[in-house]
Amino acid sequence: MFLAQEIIRKKRNGLALCSEEIQFFVQGITTNSVSEGQIAALGMAVYFNDMNMDERIALTTAMRDSGTVLNWQSLELNGPVIDKHSTGGVGDVISLMLGPMAAACGGYVPMISGRGLGHTGGTLDKFDAIPGYQTEPSSELFRKVVKEVGVAIIGQTGDLVPADKRFYSIRDNTATVESISLITASILSKKLACNLDALAMDVKVGSGAFMPTYEASEELARSIAAVANGAGTKTTALLTDMNQVLASCAGNAVEVKEAIDFLTGAYRNPRLYEVTMGLCAEMLLLGGLASNEADARAKLNRVLDNGRAAELFGKMVSGLGGPADFVENYSKYLPQSQIIRPVFADMQGYAYSMDTRELGLAVVTLGGGRRKPGDALDYSVGLTQVCALGDKVDSSTPIAVIHAQSEAAFAEAELAVKKAIHIGETAPEKTPEIYAYIRASDL
């Protein structure tokens, strides 16, 4: 028998907690036998004194086991259960292509995603732009679509990781969100509750990333790779660039359109292609669906070129309540804003740098993102044709096209976009889309 206050005292004094102490405390979070004040105190103690890898693994697995852990055995799936998670960015539409691509190569992708908050977009918000699509289906329907289609992208159900929900809301109110140990446990407990065979983790770096510096992003990526592998899930973390918008657009309906254009081959943004292929190839390798990276990329290109990935996206949409002809006729279903107009830079030159976070906040200002949880969204608004770093811009080449519902909203977004995209006389040095892979062998 443990006492919550003694566990807090031990961590306050900089000592390591044993797994039984951590399990006891997490159980208390779930059953409400540990008070809000005690949870806040432990969060602050961890924030200042950190946790070693054994503690992080114990916290992650205890939180994972605080609710339902999905079981796929009864479905007799004939392939690995694989997934990816991103720390969030702007124009990060990867999940919409990656899920069907991995499924078309023989994987099963039960992706539980989140909504956007602050400057980052949420995968679920993009699916909410599709009429009829159920982001909160019954567990029976979720399992049915995973088995029959190979991919289902939905929201977190109430019985998954209840400890994280309570802990996170208290951390948010007590300034302990920015702890690498607690971020690691929060992210991974939700993913590992899906009982995955393998996970590819996309940790963003740069002006649109959650972590402020490359070093902090790398520390988080290493922590996630170490803890996930330590908890028994084959995991690789990729450090990817978020110093500019990832796709050519940012918003909800506009990103769904770009995802379908990518899957059908109508248009593939080269940066988006590189990061999507890097993550998806890693999923195939970890899941045993490819023998090496070249083999994985060849398989992925095949399912893009033969239309199989686009077909599975369509089947997932209709399986979860959306229109059966969505891929073929998406323009009929996606909402469109009142004003669609380009914005031009005040000088000619090259797109030299971007404050990606500010571009994400411009989408929020238009009504396409949330200032606080629960805010209603306008799925039609956003940015399209966003220039890439190094692009030449002048009076006839826009730096972006704004989709707005009013002149006032357009004017506000225009100012924000001009301020966020810096024009220089020369093109900047090219940076890689993927900075590093952190595999189990690198830890």
Curated annotation (Swiss-Prot):
Q: Which GO terms describe its cellular component?
A: cytosol
Keywords, A to Z?
Glycosyltransferase, Transferase
User: InterPro entries per the record?
Assistant: Glycosyl_Trfase_fam3 (IPR000312), Glycosyl_Trfase_fam3_N_dom (IPR017459), Glycosyl_Trfase_fam3_N_dom_sf (IPR036320), Nuc_phospho_transferase (IPR035902), PYNP-like_C_sf (IPR036566), PYNP_C (IPR013102), Pyrmidine_PPas_bac/euk (IPR018090), Pyrmidine_PPase_CS (IPR017872)
Could you tell me one molecular function GO term of this UniProt entry? thymidine phosphorylase activity
Q: Quote the NCBIfam families the UniProt record gives.
A: PRK05820.1, T_phosphoryl, Y_phosphoryl
PANTHER family, per the entry: THYMIDINE PHOSPHORYLASE (PTHR10515:SF0)
Q: Which HAMAP family match?
A: Thymid_phosp
Protein name as annotated: Thymidine phosphorylase
Please give the organism.
Shewanella baltica (strain OS155 / ATCC BAA-1091)
Q: What is the lineage of its organism?
A: Bacteria, Pseudomonadati, Pseudomonadota, Gammaproteobacteria, Alteromonadales
